[in-house]
Amino acid sequence: MLKSIKLSCLTVVLIGIITTFAGCSVVENIEKKLGWKTDYFQYLDSENVEQISIQSTRDLGFKFIVTEGSAKNTMYNLLSKAQKSTEKSNLEPDYIFEFDLGDEVKKFYYVVGSESGNFYNDTDVYTVSNRIDEVIIQNLSFIRKPKEFNYIYYKPILEVLKKIEPSLKDKDYKIGINIKSDADCLKYIFSNDLKDFTSDAEKIISNIELVQTTTAGYDVVITVKNRGYDTLVYKTAITVNNKRENTEEIYYVVAQYEYKKWNISISEPNVKPSNW
């Protein structure tokens, strides 16, 4: 282990020395031989790329186009460090990337996160460790993503599950969580996060799963619908529809980001707060 660390450090030092006395092409060749850089995305490092489009798979209205030269170069620098993989991720893709070369469009699917084989198409599979979508999104002024989105989105749902768990305990109900219609937040929801959330939800209610297509086959459906947000304020309604007992309960969530943390308030069933 120590020998491996020393070897890695020595390699970095050597590259640093070479960088001082040689051109970038020499360093790039070394990186390629070490497997730190790939030639496949070389076409991004040229004027042949007219534009790069990035489309959310969950929110079809969320698509942005990259045409600016420095942004395309940034994309190339990230993808050139992708590692060739043998198998693609088994999670649903979060984005579709299309590289328009004029006479050809190269299409890739991207699973956000460090999941192996998370950038792929029908013929090639790569692992991208960096969040390539954030490089672009962070420069979009119209994005008002709530701070610590994963926490403020999934935490209230888990808290509602804890509230309803006693009434569902020991009942042979098929329970589904429906977030597919939560249009305002779909652009921020990613497969790796859903996997973690589902695991946490199953610890509270074992017979629960995410609704994939239709709610028809479920006895209890928990629907999440955002009612407004900005970076510091968040409101959502979580509806629990028990088809077996013909009941419906709505939990109103109001959260404020203060002193570097979210203060979350969840109402009693069907009691709308005054600040809603």
Regions found by a protein language model. Give the residues of each.
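Bacterial N-terminal signal peptides that target proteins for export
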Residues: 1-10
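Function-determining sites in protein domains
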Residues: 24-276
